[in-house]
């Protein structure tokens, strides 16, 4: 896995620039975003039809770039988070975390 460019930029006090991906599971998307200067992408599984297979494919295509990949999972559930991390995602964004227990479940799953 390539180093997390988002983490590096943040540590240097720079502001990473990125995109949220809601549609289009084509192999050209990572290259387009790289040429556009993106430092990171958030793949949204909460508000679209991306399933885990689509998302894993996108993550693998982004690994050919220096773009850090984060995924907004549909819910805080171990199977979603573990699969994203196992696929090579750099991190997850979890929706509707409303308690310390939910936040801890998220950390435990990662």
Language-model features: locations:
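Expand to "…catalyze enediolate/carbanion chemistry for C-C bond making/breaking, isomerization
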Residues: 1-110
